[in-house]
């Protein structure tokens, strides 16, 4: 279900300034073949106030994106209210509950994982979240690197995704990063 990508979200504060970043690799896999190495699986939403990224089935992920973006617009960019309403709406539709995709959504204050089953999970530390086949590698690397206060947030995301790309056969090191 979650093959062929790694997405990492990272938010926090450095030097009194809040930051939020999301990064992902570019690999798309169909079965056991790499069909694209430079796909974009991250995007900014609501006037560049929210970042998002997906892992899983591309068609299902776009369904997730569209639905979430519509709710985010209706809530005027309030991420917390949007994920709650997203989950409520999700659970009402039998088709939606079977989507094979996950998303990370974050802003300067919150970071959430949205699943294709309608679950909403706030990152344990409200700081780092990762999804996809290389998600556990990226999450582990990001948590370790986060303990070094001197590392810039963009560099942390980049290095964590590189580690995931080196270890996970469904993840490459063609990394794209967005930040608020």
From Swiss-Prot:
Regulation: Allosterically activated by HslU binding.
Transmembrane segments: none
Positions that bind Na(+): 165, 168, 171
Record-listed E.C. numbers: 3.4.25.2
PROSITE patterns membership: PROTEASOME_BETA_2 (PS51476)
Cellular compartments annotated: Cytoplasm
Catalysed conversion reaction: ATP-dependent cleavage of peptide bonds with broad specificity
GO biological process annotation, one example: proteolysis involved in protein catabolic process
Superkingdom assignment: Bacteria
Record keywords: Allosteric enzyme, Cytoplasm, Hydrolase, Metal-binding, Protease, Sodium, Threonine protease
GO MF, any single term: metal ion binding
Top EC group: hydrolase
A cellular component annotation (GO) from this entry: proteasome core complex
Active site, renumbered: 5
Keyword Hydrolase: yes
UniProt record similarity statement: Belongs to the peptidase T1B family. HslV subfamily.
Subunit-level organization: A double ring-shaped homohexamer of HslV is capped on each side by a ring-shaped HslU homohexamer. The assembly of the HslU/HslV complex is dependent on binding of ATP.
HAMAP family to which the protein is assigned, alphabetical: HslV
Protein name: ATP-dependent protease subunit HslV
Organism from which the protein derives: Helicobacter pylori (strain Shi470)
């Amino acid at each position: 279900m979650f093959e062929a990508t790694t997405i990492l979200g990272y938010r926090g504060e450095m030097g009194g300034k809040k930051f939020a970043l999301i990064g992902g690799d570019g690999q798309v896999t169909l079965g056991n073949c790499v069909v694209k190495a430079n796909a974009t699986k991250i995007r900014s939403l609501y006037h560049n106030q929210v970042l998002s990224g997906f892992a899983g089935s591309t068609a299902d992920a776009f369904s997730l994106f569209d639905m979430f973006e519509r709710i985010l617009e209706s809530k005027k960019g309030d991420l917390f209210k949007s994920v709650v309403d997203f989950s409520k709406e999700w659970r009402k539709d039998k088709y939606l509950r079977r989507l094979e995709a996950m998303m990370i959504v974050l802003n300067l204050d919150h970071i959430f994982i949205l699943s294709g089953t309608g679950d909403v999970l706030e990152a344990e530390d409200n700081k780092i979240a990762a999804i996809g086949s290389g998600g556990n590698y990226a999450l582990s690397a990001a948590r370790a690197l986060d303990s070094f206060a001197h590392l810039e947030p963009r560099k942390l995301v980049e290095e964590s995704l590189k580690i995931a790309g080196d270890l996970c056969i469904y993840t490459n090191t063609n990394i794209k990063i967005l930040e608020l």
